[in-house]
Curated annotation (Swiss-Prot):
Pathway: Secondary metabolite metabolism; methylglyoxal degradation; (R)-lactate from methylglyoxal: step 2/2. Zn(2+) 2 binds at D57, H58, D127, H165. Its EC number is 3.1.2.6. Keywords: Hydrolase, Metal-binding, Zinc. The keyword Metal-binding applies. Pfam families: HAGH_C, Lactamase_B. This is Hydroxyacylglutathione hydrolase. The lineage of its organism: Bacteria, Pseudomonadati, Pseudomonadota, Gammaproteobacteria, Enterobacterales. The keyword Transcription regulation does not apply. Binds 2 Zn(2+) ions per subunit.
């Protein structure tokens, strides 16, 4: 399988997962034009659209793409039914597409109905997990988002984190702020700076990398707890996450 990230809008990525038969899945098409252009130029036939949540920068291109390919199914959570979804998915559902078994994961937090799609090694996680960061809490609670991230980290460490935005540089600045002595973050920040200077993407990263450099996955880290001024009991680690998310919102 080939994975293509199409940069769109200000900082979005639309993901295409392409098999050797030149068939593909489209994930979170916020706009249609770059998708339709890529499909035409490369003679690729789309077989399905996968939606993670209802925000317009993830669903805005659905109608135009379906107009060009009218028989194509659109999978998504119930919250996307008004944005072109034709097949509602729920937690622990499995899809069989392009010869892949795709597991559906409910990840509430950014929105209440947010879903992710996992087919090893690819995790299409929308706006839940970013490289070195996580999504804002527009609808869900801090505890819901913390639990969603805890679910993600149970996946294999070679999982490719196919998130929907190029936020890595700014996220790493915050990571350095709350974990200033973390050498892995410092080294990775240098790597990302070089990539962005060349206008190259920083995603997908791997879950292994994220466990090292993403403060939102390191809420058990004593240094992090001390630096944010919120040491807590093991059964209340989500409160560290809540404090961290509030800090990031105003950083």
């Amino acid at each position: 399988m080939d994975l293509i990230g199409l940069p769109t809008l200000q900082d979005n990525y639309i993901w295409l997962l392409i098999n050797p038969q030149h068939q593909c899945l489209i994930v979170d098409p916020g706009v249609a034009a770059p998708v339709l252009h890529y499909l035409t130029e490369n003679r690729i036939t789309p077989k399905a659209i996968l939606l993670t949540h209802h925000h317009n920068d993830h669903v805005g291109g659905v109608a135009e793409i379906v107009q060009a390919y009218p028989e194509m199914p659109v999978y998504g959570p119930a919250e996307t039914q008004g944005q072109g979804c034709t097949q509602v998915v729920a937690d622990n559902d499995t899809l069989s597409l392009l010869g892949c078994q795709i597991s559906i994961m409910a990840l509430p937090g950014h929105t209440l109905g947010h879903m992710a799609y996992y087919s090893a090694p690819y995790l299409f996680c929308g706006d839940t997990l970013f490289s070195a960061g996580c999504g804002r809490l527009f609808e869900g609670s801090a505890q819901q988002m913390f639990d969603s991230l805890q679910r993600i980290i149970q996946l294999p460490d070679n999982t490719l984190v196919c998130c929907a935005h190029e936020y890595t540089e700014s996220n790493l600045r915050f990571a350095r702020h709350v974990l200033p002595k973390n050498r892995e973050i410092e080294t990775y920040q240098q790597h990302v700076t070089i990539l962005r200077a060349k206008q190259q993407p920083t995603v997908p990263s791997t879950l292994r990398i994220e466990m090292e450099i993403n403060p939102f996955l390191r809420c058990y880290d004593y240094d992090l707890q001390r630096n944010v001024g919120f040491p807590t009991q093991p059964n209340e680690i989500w409160r560290v996450f809540a404090c961290l998310r509030n800090m990031k919102d105003s950083f």
